Structures are given as C-alpha cells and as structure tokens.
Amino acid sequence: MCGIVGIIGSGPAAAKIVEALKRLEYRGYDSAGVATLEDGKLARRRAQGKLRNLEERLAKEPLNGPLGIGHTRWATHGKPTENNAHPHASDKLAVVHNGIIENFRELRDELRGKGHNFVSETDTEVVAHLVTEEMRGGKGPADAVKAALPRLRGAFALAFVFDGHPNLLIGARQGAPLAVGFGEGEMFLGSDALALAPFTSDIAYLEDGDWVVLTRDDADFRNAAGAKVSRPRLKSQASAFLVDKGNHRHFMAKEIHEQPEVVGRTLAHYLDMSSGAVRLPFELPFDPKALTRITITACGTAYYAGLVAKYWFEKFARLPVEIDVASEFRYREAPLPEGGLMIVVSQSGETADTLACLRYAKENGQRTLAVVNVPTSTIARESDVAAPTLAGPEIGVASTKAFTCQLSVLACLAIALGRARGALDAAREAELVSELIAVPGLLAEVVKSTAATEKLAATLAKARDVLYLGRGTAYPLALEGALKLKEISYIHAEGYAAGELKHGPIALIDEEMPVIVIAPSDPVLEKTVSNMQEVAARGGRVILISDDHAVHEAAINLEAHLPMPAMSPDFAAIVYAAPIQLLAYYTAVHMGKDVDQPRNLAKSVTVE
C-alpha cells in the first residue's frame, strides 16, 4: 500500500526521501509528497501521479531542510489529487500515514466542533488535527502523540515532524509495518528495509502499539502504555543495488526470467541433493505424526500457491487440508481442531488479512508456519516457524518469482511431512526430490523460448474475455493465469476447473472466446482432452499449454500451442506457472499497459 519514509540528519533530506520513495514504488501509488523542516519551519511539496512529477516540483521549489518525511499514496479515502496527497499538515505538524483510520468521521466531527478546519477528503488529516488539539492543550509533541494514538481505530503506520522542533521525528505503528534505521548522526523511518537500504542496513521494527521518538543520535522506543521498551536491532539483507531492471524492459520481465535462479536457490535451501532428501532449515515445533489437519490461508496469488499445495499435502503427507482466502477466513470464527497446523503464505509478510488469520490461529491453539519472502516481517516474527522463500525483492506488482518460490517451499514441506509421518518411504522421497531438482532447468528452458507466446499475445490482446481451464494442480494455475491477465492487461478473464465447464461456463463458448487450457501430461489428461473437444465442438478457440504428447492426445485443431518440455506431473505446476506469466506480460506490453504498476493495485496490502 502506501510508502512512508522519514529522515533526520545533517544534509538536505528531500532528495534522500525521494530516492527512498522510489524503492517503494512497487507497492503502488497515485500521488506523492515531501515535508521538511528548514530553520525550524515546515514546508511541503506534493504532486498527483508519479514521483517524477514530485521531482519536477522540487526542482522548481526546492526543500533543503535536514529533517523530513515523505509518502507515496494509494487512495483509500478521497480521490488521488494533490490536495489529498500526503503529508497532511496543521499549523503545528505534518504527518504521513499508511493504513486506514476507521473512526475518522467521528473524530473529524468532534474536531470541527472545536474549531479545526479540514481541507482534504482523507482520514489522515484527522490525525494531524487530533495531535494538534492535544498540543494546544499544553502537551509537547511526544506526549501529544501518546495521547492521540489510543483514540485511533484501525491499522496504521505514522510519521510526524513538528514545527519548531528541528531534532525530532516520531513514528507509530498499529497493524501496518514501520522500521527504524540507524545511521551515523542520522536516523530513518521506513515502511520496509528496502526503502532504507541505500542509507543503512541496521534496522529495528516497531511492534503493534509501539511509537518511537527519534533524534539524530538516538531512538527512544515506547509501547502503547508509554513505557520504554527495547526492540532488537537486525542486519537487513536488503541491498541498495537491488532495484534495477537490468537489461529488461520491466521489473516483471526481469523477475520472470530470474525464476530458474531463485527457485534453484530456494530448493537448495531445503534439499540435500546428494542424499535425495528434504532437509528443512529449521526445527518443526510440533510432532508431524500428531497433526490432524492443515489449514492454509493467504490472499491473491499466494492463495493460489496454497491451493496447489493442498494437492501436495493431501497426496504426499496424507493430511486433510482446508484452504480459504484470508479475508473470508478471519471473519468466519471457524472451529480449529486440536492438533491442527495453520500455514499462512505471504510474499511481504505484512498482508493484513493473512496476519489476522495467523493471530486467530494462535489464539485458538494452532501451531503456525509462515511461508514468507521477508524473513524480518511481522508474519515471520509472529509465527511459530517461518519458512523463507529466497526470491529476493519482488518489485513488479503482479507476483511471479515469489509465487514459484512459494510453490517450491510448499512442495518441500509436503515431502518433509510425508516422510516424517511415514506416508512416504525413502525411495519415494528421493524420487520426488529428484523431480524438484529438475525444476530450475525446466524453468530455464521455458523462459528463454518465448516466440510462440509473443505471437499469441498479439492475438489475445484483441480479446474481450478469456477463459482458463485446468485440472488437478493445473486448476489453481488456471485461476492464477486469469488473475495475471486481469491484473496487468485489464482483459476480463476467468479460471475454472475443467470438469466444471459443463456446469455453466460452456454457455460462454463461441467463436470469439479464447480458451486457454493448461494440461500437463498427468493422470487426468484424458479428462482434460474431453473438455477441449467440447470447446472445439462449439467453435471455441482452444489454446493449449502442454507438451507434444498432449497435443497428440487432443487430436483437434488448436488456435495455438505453447510448447512445454516433458516432465513428471508431480511438480509441473511450478514450471507451468512461467508460460501463463509470460502470456499475460506480453499481452499487456502489446496493449501498452503499465506492467509494473497496474492501475488501482498495490503490492503489499497492509489494510483490510
């Protein structure tokens, strides 16, 4: 969602703030702004649209103060206009905010009754005036923030600077991430470590309810009660040099092509390739034999990774699996069994709905395991055990390499649990590990052979609607393929289990409808072929993603075939993810869309 940066140091802060905000562009945004303190006085510059618009504004109207805050906004309350852009200010302070203040209308009405004037449509402006009201009552900045925070309902991260206080930067967190960076004679606030990587790798994270008072040389952490607390200082693994497209046109293209490397790196972290066994890089805090059920919750693409994993856990570990989207599960008050394990999947480790599910599971006596790409994230810290993906920072809003790395980790977990529970013997484990070892090479073969995909994309770009079909682990890929196409090309697409075709979707089939069938050579290929023939019989345009064997079995005229190498079906889902990503990518590029920052989308959804 929104990105927050704060800097207190000795040199001009605005340029550094903009540099840090560029590293948060991947979160998605529609406006940006900076506020600094120069000679003790607040000044703001804001702009609608991309950061380059803010840079142009700053070039004409520079800010030179050594203390400042910056923000990239993703609209939740109020349209994406300059007037609604952060920082918001009163006569005493400026504030930036990530999250949602749920009771802002109630607070706004109260503050209006006390003479406060509001000039924006946002919930954030209420925070500025609420703290200002406390200061008008005689409190200093820190005490005013302390008094205001308990009155705010919702999830938020905040950063404040105060008129007349040139050595003071205050941050607060409730439900949305916020990190403190430690420098030499300067201190930093940021939504994540990636934003602060050019300046420091020495990081501490606020916990829920925390607020922190920063000066150039010190960080004073306080909990919700105002008591002094310590938070561990960690060495961030984020690099100042990671945000780079290399020789690719878009981050998404780069990240698709990085998959052979990062999937290989992730698998190497979990597999003993010489012995043909899974070696988890952590101790499981439970007895696998005592598990009674697995519950998986996640959002978006991570949910589809969990849906693939359901097949693996049931097949290899012989465990029943329930999976639900986190935004639904968290409100269901679902009964959870004794001996249950909750697995949550999140690229950022900060997804609000997924975090709520994790906390619900812990409150109800479940063991918890998190598959995350950010090992220092809130979800990683709060779970019983974190299973890291080694995808590296993913900048494109549409997830690609994080998805295949999530699948890789979940596959290893399924094998490990199956072996520990006696559902797999050593020979079968070695066979499955051998299949996983082959995955990076198969991915490399797919991502370097894009001619057929690029040609098909030019045709697909003219479609109004697209249908994706699959069975088994290819069914979640059909859902993911439809999501990818919707996300970045804005073409309406739907994914279905191929066996459900006759239960409704077949009514949509005509000569205008492209039907993309994901069909590895697996035990249900014959059934999938019958579905393709049903589509062809009704004039539908069948596009097959599979190997040559499936083409031969289909025995129909295909509009297009995206060729895949022959492989074992067990983990074909990891490899078959690449062509659906590439097809969405090239279609969107052909249409001239903003692939890395599609409209209305955010990378890390830290609000409900």
Which residue stretches match the model-derived regions?
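Glycine-rich phosphate-binding loops that contact phosphosugars or nucleotide phosphates
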Residues: 289-431, 435-438, 518-560, 583, ...
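Extended hydrophobic-aromatic, low-complexity segments
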Residues: 181, 305-307, 322-323, 352-355, ...
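Generic C-terminus detector
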Residues: 226, 252, 541, 567-608
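Active-site phosphate/pyrophosphate-binding segments
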Residues: 259-263, 267-295, 364, 385-514, ...
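Buried hydrophobic positions in well-ordered alpha/beta secondary-structure cores of metabolic enzymes
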Residues: 2, 28, 69, 99, ...
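Glycine-rich oxoanion-binding loops at beta->alpha junctions
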Residues: 49, 66-83, 274-286, 309-345, ...
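Generic beta-strand/beta-sheet core signal
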Residues: 96, 161, 172, 181-183, ...
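Conserved short alpha-helical segments that host acidic/polar catalytic motifs at enzyme active sites
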Residues: 1-245, 249-250, 258-292, 304, ...
